[in-house]
Design a protein with these regions (language model features):
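Glycine/charge-rich catalytic "coupling/switch" loops of P-loop NTPases
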Residues: 141-195, 225-253
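Residues located in well-ordered beta-strands
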Residues: 104, 130-132, 195-197
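Short, acidic/hydrophobic/Gly-rich beta-strand patch recurrent on exposed beta strands
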Residues: 141-145, 171, 207-212, 220
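A short macromolecule-binding patch
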Residues: 150-151, 217-220
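C-terminal boundary and immediately downstream tail of ABC-type ATPase nucleotide-binding domains
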Residues: 111-136, 171, 238
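ABC ATPase nucleotide-binding domains
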Residues: 1-116, 120
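Structural detector for hydrophobic anchor residues on beta-strands
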Residues: 128-129, 192, 217
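Short, conserved beta-turn/loop elements at beta-strand boundaries and strand-helix junctions
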Residues: 137-139, 199-205
Length: 253
């Protein structure tokens, strides 16, 4: 018990009654009760769900420290993708009881297997738009609304070539949409027109909520962005980071 209390930094709480403990302290006591059993595997089922936002962040750090100290397996169940991404070394993404993808946090973010995983992992979530693929002068393009962007050659696989003339789902993460003039001028093949509906200054960055080809898009741009509500602006996609999915199966192409 003393060793578990030392690991969790709750030695000074051992003589207190439960009613005298804060929410975070009670969570650590609960983990201590598990630690003293010296288990080979810890199973945690949404242990942070009843905590406020500030305490939840603090307890995420505590659990990661505990995992590092004990060097044992933790199975952690959560509906919060932020908890999964920040705490997991390997994540199982499930939908309706069916496993969608098992991978590292980095691969789930950069190489999602389907639309569900792509939209679930990441905040703000990935933007999606239905587009038609075409081929002109040896290059493949995705067209949606009045916009047409070129797909980088590195992403044009034989499988993707099979979708020429068909509709697909194109996904792009908010941080891969840029409104600064230098980037736009360097990517003329990836420029789109967008209407600014809402802006949110987040401090180190700004979120732009855009109407683009009839779809709602979110862009995470530099805090120095001059875009204002009601503006029609040009944005450019970082096309080497786009994701393309089959429209019917929603699986990555």
């Amino acid at each position: 018990v003393t060793e578990a209390a030392k690991i969790l930094d709750i030695e000074h709480l051992l003589d207190r009654k439960p009613k005298a403990l804060s929410g975070g302290q009670r969570q650590r006591v609960a983990m201590g009760r598990a630690i003293v059993r010296n288990p080979k595997v810890f199973l945690m089922d949404e242990p942070l769900s009843n905590l406020d936002a500030k305490l939840r962040v603090a307890m995420r750090t505590e659990i990661k420290k505990l995992h590092n100290k004990l060097q044992t397996t933790f199975m952690y169940v959560t509906h919060d993708q932020t908890e999964a991404m920040t705490m997991g070394t390997r994540i199982v993404v499930m939908k309706d009881g069916v496993i969608q993808q098992v991978d590292t946090p980095a691969n789930l973010y950069t190489k999602p297997d389907n639309v569900f995983v792509a939209g679930f992992i990441g905040s703000p979530q990935m933007n999606f738009v239905t587009a038609t693929l075409s081929k002109e002068n040896g290059s493949v393009y995705a067209s949606f609304g009045d916009n047409k962007i070129m797909i980088p050659n590195g992403k044009v696989t034989p499988e993707l070539e099979g979708y020429i003339g068909k509709e697909v789902i194109v996904g792009i993460r908010p941080e891969d949409i840029h409104d600064d003039e230098a980037f736009i001028s360097s990517r003329p093949e990836a420029v789109c027109n967008a209407y600014v509906e809402v802006t949110e200054m987040m401090g180190a960055e700004t979120y732009l909520y855009l109407e683009l080809a009839g779809e709602q898009f979110t862009a995470r741009v530099n805090q120095r962005s001059t875009a204002k509500i009601g503006d029609t602006i040009k944005v450019a996609f970082e096309t080497n980071k786009i994701h393309i999915f089959d429209k019917d199966t929603e699986m990555a192409i």
